[in-house]
Amino acid sequence: MMGKQLTAQVPAEPVVLGKMGSSYGIRGWLRVFSSTEDAESIFDYQPWFIQKADQWQQVQLESWKHHNQDLIIKLKGVDDRDAANLLTNCEIVVDSSQLPALEEGDYYWKDLMGCQVVTAEGYDLGKVIDMMETGSNDVLVIKANLKDAFGIKERLVPFLDGQVIKKVDLATRTIEVDWDPGF
């Protein structure tokens, strides 16, 4: 059985860095989809955790390589297609303490979730419920308050530091923006 020899630790602050795709070949290799900015960075953060049947398991990366357009991985103890297929669609999770400290002005998406977004004039635009990548910049998806004066349900505000985003205060969970509340 996989993972028996490892004491299953639990990531204190789980962060999803990617997910496992379909099996590749017959020796237990799997495709991997990385959501890190540079796809290969996902291999820098170890150990990986996965959740199966509501249990955390630590998995050990044995090796990885490029194959055509894909990244494929070999996990320790996963030696055939059947074992690999059990992991398809499992999210790859690390503890946030394994991630590098960010530079000023950079934030992890997970830290912005649930933040209250207000304009410089003090108008409450709502709460961050999601983030979107548009290619040129990230976009905050903000769920407006029930009694929004403009009758808006959801706002999309570009995460442009300095230009739109004036201040991010993670201690008070607020983001101050220069944005017209009518949008």
UniProtKB/Swiss-Prot annotation:
InterPro entries recorded: PRC_barrel-like_sf, PRC_RimM, RimM, RimM_N, RimM_N_sf, Transl_B-barrel_sf
A GO CC term attached to the entry: ribosome
Entry annotated with the keyword Nucleus: no
Claim: Cytoplasm is one of the keywords in the record: yes
This protein's UniProt keywords: Chaperone, Cytoplasm, Ribosome biogenesis, rRNA processing
GO molecular function: ribosome binding
GO BP term (any one): rRNA processing
Primary location group: cytoplasm
Pfam families the record matches: PRC_RimM, RimM
Span of domain PRC barrel: 104-183
Compartments, record wording: Cytoplasm
Coiled-coil positions: none
Gene3D superfamilies documented for this protein: PRC-barrel domain (2.30.30.240), RimM (2.40.30.60)
Signal sequence segment: none
PANTHER family for this protein: RIBOSOME MATURATION FACTOR RIMM
Function field: An accessory protein needed during the final step in the assembly of 30S ribosomal subunit, possibly for assembly of the head region. Essential for efficient processing of 16S rRNA. May be needed both before and after RbfA during the maturation of 16S rRNA. It has affinity for free ribosomal 30S subunits but not for 70S ribosomes.
Complex and partners: Binds ribosomal protein uS19.
Family of this protein: Belongs to the RimM family.
Record remark on domains: The PRC barrel domain binds ribosomal protein uS19.
Name of this protein: Ribosome maturation factor RimM
